[in-house]
Regions:
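N-terminal acidic, glycine/proline-rich low-complexity segments
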Residues: 1-213
């Protein structure tokens, strides 16, 4: 008779701030769900934007990213209390004050912790750029992981880059932040079709059905 199965304990290795455009493509909420369920990381904040590229279709309503992110937290980890500040709906060059989301990033970076801080961004770099402009020493206290940028090595148009190109230019050219970039040619290797999403999510219990819809 086999012994009962046991879960192998997983220690927290990093603090993570998850930044994305949760009111845009559905991949943002799927990525957030994945991050919240990853036992080796501690999600300390969830920051969002509601921006669209020039000449594109209208984007999310201000507050919609914040609302969607909070709902995912309630579904998956209701006992946790990551900071979920207001969406940033103003492009980097038009900001007249530091966004709430950027302030949350700076506040978390100031905390004393044995866990290194990673900021994972799957949308525009607006919040990160504004935080780095406010306090350039932030670059020494966090590592940025960004899904964005054109095909390597030639570059070119890419959605997350186009959402706020000046923000990306500031982060790459005006800061000393350590950046792990996953450009178009890399993240397209992880593409899912609508049919696959329907099969995996809609049959994955109440939360999966909610996420798909």
């Amino acid at each position: 008779m086999s012994a009962p199965s046991r879960r192998i304990p997983v220690a927290k290795l990093t603090r993570v701030i998850v930044d994305n455009d949760y009111a845009g493509d559905p991949d943002g909420l799927v990525a957030l769900a994945h991050q919240l369920l990853t036992e080796s990381t501690e999600v300390v904040a969830i920051t969002g934007t509601t921006l669209t590229p020039p000449h594109d279709m209208p984007g999310g309503v201000p507050g919609s990213a914040q609302s969607a992110a909070r709902e995912v937290v309630q579904w998956l980890t209701p006992a946790t209390e990551p900071a979920v500040p207001a969406d940033t709906s103003t492009p980097f060059l038009e900001l007249t004050s530091i966004p709430d989301a950027s302030r949350v990033i700076l506040d978390e970076a100031e905390k004393s912790s044995d866990l290194p801080l990673f900021v994972t961004c799957g949308g525009p770099l607006t919040n990160i750029a504004a935080a780095l402009r406010e306090d350039p020493t932030l670059a020494e206290r966090m590592t940025l992981c960004w899904i964005g940028g054109g095909a390597y090595p030639e570059g070119g148009w890419e959605y997350n880059l186009a959402l706020d190109t000046p923000a990306a230019q500031f982060v790459f050219n005006e800061s000393s932040a350590e950046i792990h970039q996953f450009p178009l040619t890399t993240y397209r290797q992880c593409a899912y079709s609508i049919a696959e999403l329907e099969f995996v999510l809609s049959g994955g219990g109440p939360f999966g059905a909610w996420l798909y819809e």
